[in-house]
A protein has these predicted regions:
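Active-site loop signature of alpha/beta-hydrolase-fold enzymes
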Residues: 40-42, 110, 144, 174
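Beta-strand-loop-alpha "switch" segments that mediate conformational coupling across diverse proteins
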Residues: 154-185, 200
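Conserved catalytic-core segment of NTP-binding enzymes
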Residues: 3, 28, 33, 84-169
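NTP-binding/hydrolysis catalytic cores, primarily Walker-type P-loop NTPases
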Residues: 184-216
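Active-site catalytic microenvironments for nucleophilic, acid-base chemistry
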Residues: 24-28, 121, 206, 210
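P-loop/Walker-type NTP enzyme "switch/lid" segment
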Residues: 2-8, 12, 23-92, 156, ...
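Hydrophobic positions on the alpha1 helix immediately C-terminal to the Walker A/P-loop
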Residues: 16-17
């Protein structure tokens, strides 16, 4: 399955999600490869850091050297693509090959507007997968304080956008994600019993229900 993790607006946390998902899949025994199409190359940097620190499982991250869609479709396992608006040509090509698009949306009106524009681009410019491309959005970097209304308001606004499914599993803004990246590790590798780790397991299990278990 080809999952493209994308958003028009910067700062959505897509590279962090892509990295944690890639390691989560690998830790469940899945064959997974990643494509880093973002000029910032965060996913590639994290994979290189893991290699230097000899952290297992090792991640296999590729850049594009040929026709992108052919590369993506050549892999038999799970494919994760990290791409943003800074590489619009690659984004459009990746979206054309995607089985599903995962859109992380921080809790703000500006991010809702960006998501709305992103959906317009998909419908206008992207040749849909013949089997249908699933469009999934979720609130990323959600407020940990439940009394702050922006998270719920963002989720409600996303639910009003046509043609998109809103995942109920939020990823909250926790320092564990930021700190673990500096070590080339995921939040569930460094702090397996933390709130952030448990929230991510729930989130990933919803995306891959056939792997709905915490790895031993």
């Amino acid at each position: 399955m080809i999952t493209v993790i994308a958003n028009l607006k910067g700062g959505s946390g897509k590279s962090t999600i892509a990295f944690n998902l890639a390691v989560w899949l690998a830790s469940h025994g899945e064959k997974v490869v990643g494509y880093d199409l973002d000029p910032q190359c965060t996913l590639s940097d994290l994979a290189e850091l893991r290699k230097e620190e000899e952290v297992k499982p090792e991640l296999h991250i590729h850049s594009v050297r040929a026709v992108l869609q052919e590369q993506l479709q050549a892999h038999p396992g799970e494919v994760l693509v990290d791409v943003g608006a800074a590489n619009m040509a690659a984004m459009k090509e990746a979206l054309g090959a995607a089985d599903r698009v995962l859109i992380p949306v921080p809790p703000s009106q500006a991010d809702v507007w960006a998501t709305q524009r992103f959906l317009h681009i998909i419908k206008r410019d992207i040749k849909a997968n013949p089997n249908g491309t699933e469009l999934l959005a979720f609130v990323n970097r959600a407020d940990t304080n439940e009394s702050i209304p922006e998270t719920g308001e963002t989720e409600e606004a996303l639910g009003m956008l046509p043609g998109i499914q809103v995942l109920p599993n939020r990823i909250k803004l926790r320092t564990g994600f930021r700190r673990s990246l500096s070590e080339g590790q995921t939040v569930f590798e460094m702090w397996p019993n933390s709130k952030a780790a448990k929230e991510f397991h729930v989130f990933a299990s919803a995306l891959y229900p056939e792997l709905n278990r915490i790895p031993v």
